């Protein structure tokens, strides 16, 4: 049913309803549903330090990797069911109802509220909907810079939130909570699968796990990278307009899909032209990739990469390209990079890896084609299970997102 407003504008109906409910939703001032409180800590580390983000509530250590910075005496104490609103990023959707922690403390920069007169579970679901983002955004005005907006609190408290009867609130909350819990379980499954995948990859390429019968096992061979790879230096003319960048999850992807704006130069005629099946080494480091990352181009017939990348093609007569792909997903190649990269030889997060040294790094790999194929098949199956779990998560998130759009006004 389409949204329909009554003549006085105080009653509306959502697009999607549970059977048996037809009465209109009634307007309630937001300020009548929330009641601000400020219960402060009196000593250091009185409770666990929490942070509210657009994605939800987190332990401070989950977001920042450390526990203490400045003094946390005088921080705001919260409990399960507390609404936490960011005073700086509310217009971006940094609004949460804490349903993850029994108690904790947050920075005084947040506003904290008790919820009354409606289902806390319903508000916890609504607050992550597009309708809620619009609701909060409409109570902000342009700030001192283009990226800042000021919250007009009186405007926010006076805005109307349309709510159904309590039985319908509970129906909606139960459904969306069920989906939220399923999403969380799926995320935990993906985390576990990722950890398992990494462990198996390390076990295989360190030879702790062999995938052929003992009687058929042959010694692995040490190769220089140049023994099984050829450097690619062909330049892009006008063959492609796809600027490639490396994504940890998807490998080499179109930069325009990865960033909100172009990072590469609009003129890519001097870039390397990479063809499908070829590899690129990005020497930029991160927590997940302390020695940079090596990925194979799989999504496009060709693309252009910055000349800061080291590119190469695999000699298939020596090493299976799929084997090389999985090998570079392990950390077994890090040692070779570490040996040629001087301690502290980083320039703004870019490793100082010489080209000749890179192609002279040594790698231990199976020389038997049958064992190479066995490794490829085994690791490919693990990857397929991991990707299937990711697709399942995306499907559930899409379902929940669609319901959020249609169940709320």
Regions found by a protein language model. Give the residues of each.
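Short, solvent-exposed linear patches
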Residues: 168-171, 373-374
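Sequence-specific dsDNA recognition surfaces
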Residues: 31-42, 46-80, 106, 226-236, ...
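A short glycine-rich beta-alpha junction/loop motif
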Residues: 10-14, 88, 104-109, 143-167, ...
């Amino acid at each position: 049913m389409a949204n329909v407003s009554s003549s006085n504008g105080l009653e509306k109906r959502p697009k999607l309803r549970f059977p048996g409910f037809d009465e209109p939703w009634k307007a309630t001032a937001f300020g009548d549903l929330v009641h601000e409180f400020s219960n402060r800590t009196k000593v250091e580390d009185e409770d666990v330090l929490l942070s509210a983000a657009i994605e939800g509530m987190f332990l401070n250590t989950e977001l920042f990797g450390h526990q203490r910075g400045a003094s946390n005496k005088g921080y705001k104490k919260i409990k399960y069911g507390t609404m936490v609103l960011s005073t700086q990023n509310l217009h971006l959707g940094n609004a949460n109802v804490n349903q993850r922690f029994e108690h904790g403390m947050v920075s005084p920069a947040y506003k904290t509220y008790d919820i009354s007169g409606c289902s806390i579970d319903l508000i916890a679901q609504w607050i992550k909907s597009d309708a809620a983002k619009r609701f909060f955004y409409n109570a902000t005005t342009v700030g001192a810079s283009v990226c800042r907006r000021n919250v007009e609190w009186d405007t926010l408290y006076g805005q109307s939130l349309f709510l159904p009867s309590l039985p319908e609130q509970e129906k909606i909350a139960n459904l969306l909570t069920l989906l939220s819990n399923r999403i969380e379980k799926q995320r935990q499954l993906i985390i576990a699968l990722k950890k398992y995948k990494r462990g198996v990859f390390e076990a295989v390429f360190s030879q702790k796990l062999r995938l052929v019968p003992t009687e058929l096992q042959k010694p692995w061979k040490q190769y220089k990278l140049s023994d099984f790879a050829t450097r690619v230096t062909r330049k892009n003319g006008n063959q492609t307009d796809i600027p490639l960048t490396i994504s940890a999850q998807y490998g080499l992807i179109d930069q325009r899909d990865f960033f909100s704006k172009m990072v590469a130069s609009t003129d890519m005629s001097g870039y390397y032209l990479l063809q499908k099946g070829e590899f690129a080494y990005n020497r930029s480091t991160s927590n997940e990739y302390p020695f940079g990352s090596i990925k194979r181009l799989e999504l496009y017939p060709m693309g252009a990469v910055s000349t800061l990348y080291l590119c190469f093609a695999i000699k298939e007569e020596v090493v299976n390209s799929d084997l090389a792909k999985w090998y570079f997903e392990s950390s077994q190649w890090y040692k070779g990079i570490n040996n040629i990269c001087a301690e502290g030889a980083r320039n703004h997060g870019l490793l100082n890896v010489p080209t000749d040294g890179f192609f002279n790094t040594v790698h231990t790999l199976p020389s038997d084609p049958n064992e190479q194929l066995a490794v490829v098949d085994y690791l490919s199956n693990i990857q397929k299970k991991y990707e299937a779990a990711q697709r399942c998560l995306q499907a559930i998130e899409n379902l929940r997102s669609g319901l959020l759009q249609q169940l709320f006004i």
